[in-house]
């Protein structure tokens, strides 16, 4: 019952805070209150979750997907919306990473877990020898994840993209594709009938790092050969440089993406109740 009070006001919240037993627990609660509050706003703004949904969470084992998994499990348990969550992990690395932390976290959260072996990295790096492997790898991973989600009877797939991911994608599209584009908060896939949702889009990478550290989330270390050497990393460094000069730049860029009064790239995602 304690977690539920993080998202409400009044006496219940005051009783919850009074029940805290030490400063470390207080700090963890503060982090998760902020994360869950931002996720709730995003879900409500774009109508991401409905009663009866069965949501497959794509879990790589990194900080973003592990926090998403944890937050969605809490959301399921304490928000009064009846929906199901399951985790799907594609084991794509060369060498194969240790995904024990994913399985253990799922067991703790009472979330079904599928660890699916895959030859995606073999295809991308050893057969195709891609010079820019990220796009093909992402496409293959999305396809495999969606296929498993359909097989398991899921109607939605949740991905751990956060605010910085959206802004970096926007910059990539401008500078390398010559178009104004980023991924949508909600995407409906005609081929599979699935809906892809991104509940963490109102949360910064810095906030995710802080929450993952405070919650002591176990993280699977990436074994990707291209890690840290991508165009996306260039955009991350560029965005950091911009924000050193303009500290509010990230928030204003996010506001621009959803500015319905002028040109909102995400406007078509909103639905009237």
Describe each PLM feature range:
Residues 248-273:
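A short, charged, Gly/Pro-tolerant segment at domain boundaries
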Residues 85, 156, 164-244:
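Catalytic subdomain that performs nucleotidyl-dependent activation
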Residues 35, 231-234, 238, 245, ...:
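Short, hydrophobic-biased amphipathic alpha-helical segments
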Residues 9, 20, 24-168, 176, ...:
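ATP-dependent adenylation/nucleotidyltransferase module used to activate substrates
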Residues 124-127, 231-232, 262-264:
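Short, solvent-exposed polar/charged micro-motifs at secondary-structure junctions
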